[in-house]
Amino acid sequence: MNTIHYNDIVQLPPCVATIGFFDGVHRGHQFLIHHLVETARKEGLQSTVITFDAHPRKVLQADYQPEMLSTLDSKLLLLSKTEVDNAVVLHFDKAMAAMSAREFMQQVLHDHLNVRKLFIGYDHRFGHNREETFEDYVRYGREMGIEVIRNEAFQIDGINISSSVIRSFLKEGEVEMAAQCLGFPYTLIGKVVNGFHEGRKLGFPTANLDISHFGQLIPAPGVYAVRVRLENTVVWKRGMMNVGNRPTFNGRQLTLETHIFNFDGDIYDQLLLVSFVKRIRGEQKFDSPEELAAQLKEDEQTVLVLFEKKAE
């Protein structure tokens, strides 16, 4: 897959394209991209996914804090695992936000990206204030020589899969359902930072994550079975993560603490990927650190048994 930043484009060869933010590159997105690639091959054209370098709402509302399923880098990596030829990254700014759908289709899709067919997700809208409808896109496309095609929704158990649906599952701690919709486990990336060192005192040293730079959604508070790896390695290690405010220690700040099994290395300031497997329990307040330590031992056994069953 060729990754092309919009400012670097002279002009693309004629292509079949789709446009969207593609947060998470979930199974609904994969379903659309599969149809896109199939059509492009039949037509003898290149296939192109057009996305943005920033969440549109973040550009329009400076104080908006997005809850992303993927970073731009992880999104591009996921797109590269499809069979699409090109990923075009548009720089979304206020000037682009002010463009009508007709202007965007003419100036960006037609004149610059050489789009001949445009696949639109079943619920996708674009253009200033998202004011226009699919029928408008079809009419504009007809004028410009772009065939506009609406892709059907991808469903699981009668539910239309979308990034919003996946976020809802994660906020409930339903990481297994989120993984079913994504097609892979939900994964956070963060920098390992100094914590409160309470886990080490309890016999469970943890890697504490700061994910503020990446803007990803944090699943519901609780204890999770996870797999982790450092960004520059390929080996996934088993572990368990606590998401919460440390109520036993009267904490108020949300923390992400990961105990990596059979590991006690120094990984401060490194980037760690955490892949969520299953929520073991909700967050609890214990009467003493000793009671918490006993529960952590139970949690560890629960997680180890879970991984053994998955390995069978």
Residue ranges of model-derived segments:
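Extreme N-terminal starter segment of soluble prokaryotic enzymes
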Residues: 1-3, 14-15
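Short acidic-hydrophobic, aromatic-tinged amphipathic segments that line or gate anion-handling sites
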Residues: 2-8, 88
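Residue-level signal for inorganic ion chemistry
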Residues: 26, 79, 118, 178, ...
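Cofactor-binding loop segments of dinucleotide-utilizing enzymes, especially the Rossmann-like FAD-
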Residues: 52, 92, 153
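N-terminal Rossmann-like or analogous alpha/beta NTP/dinucleotide-binding catalytic cores
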Residues: 58-144
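Phosphate/ribose-recognition catalytic cores of enzymes acting on nucleotide-derived substrates
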Residues: 195-312
